[in-house]
Amino acid sequence: SDRYSLIEGANDITCDFVLKKPSLWWCNGYGRQDIHEFTVDVQTESSSASYIQKAGVRTIDVIRQDDAWGKSMSLRLNGYDVFCKGANWIPVDNFPTRRSRSDYAELTGAAAEAGMNMLRVWGGGLYEHEDFYDACDSLGIMVWQDMAFACGMFPSDEAYLQSVTAEVRDNVRRLRNHPSLALWCGNNENEISYFEWGWNRTLTQEQREHYEAGLHRLFYEIIPEAIAKEDDTRYYHPSSPSTGHSGVPYSMGDAHMWSVWKGGWVEEYLKPHNIARFMSEYGFISYPDMFTLKKFVPEWDMRPDSPTMLAHHRAYDDTTRDPEYSNKTICRYLDRYAWVPEDFEEFV
């Protein structure tokens, strides 16, 4: 151990040391999740204090290389290429403080038992509680961390940018020592929503130029610069998805593929133009379990097309706005790949 003398006020001390043959941190399915403890003791003539920082020893590289298909996007852990298997993580409760450490352990544990080794903290949610990252550390679940920006058009005035800088630096400083944290991402769908969903067509040319300059400054300058001041060891991904808009094909990076849900058939995934290098988001609608439904649905409304169920679903087709679109899609897949349910409980 090393000793240092402190002066009154803030002290900034850098301590270099070498770990000889350290045990490494690996993701789920690739090895053990060894965690090391580093202790700092502060002593005065009359009192003392200790601080313990847990950390894992590992390297994570995001590989972006030009190749015969386009440009790769994959993760390399401790020199070994990893096939990422996982899901998107949204807030565990509409009232997050209602949840405990055991709730995070249960949910992340279920992901690990399912063979997952990565969770993407979705940008429309929040910077998660320490219990989530601790659980991921111990289970070997790598974390893709979005900044808290999603599906919207954000301002770029100086006061707002100063607030963003403070928010980003605070959260990066809080989370950077977790070995599970694999990469930072600027936002969820802010670029594709603007360039591909028609939002830019609602603006004048002058407004577009102003907003696009602000978009670039926020996610390509302000946020990565704020991250680098607290953590210059991790890859920064400006926006997810990085493909499917602005003329960038799926062969160049990560994609959000909703063709199975929106397009209607699993075969959509297999079309060459839909095969992405990293599938960072996809999904399918689902019902809550019966335990949850019985809390708010009256017995006489326990059917897919009831007013109560349709009001809670609100999953419409983008074109027809058919309120029963979700049920029709579910039934189509059940008929094709499973069986026709005999009652509502079996349907759920």
Predicted regions and their residues:
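Secreted/periplasmic carbohydrate-active enzymes, especially glycoside hydrolases
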Residues: 1-119, 138, 258
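Short N-terminal secondary-structure initiator segments
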Residues: 17-24, 36, 83-88, 95, ...
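Generic recognition of flexible, low-complexity loop/linker segments
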Residues: 24-26, 108, 170-172, 265-266
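Residue-level preference for short coil/turn positions at secondary-structure junctions
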Residues: 32, 177, 232, 273-274
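Active-site mouth of glycoside hydrolases
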Residues: 69-235, 240-242, 246-247
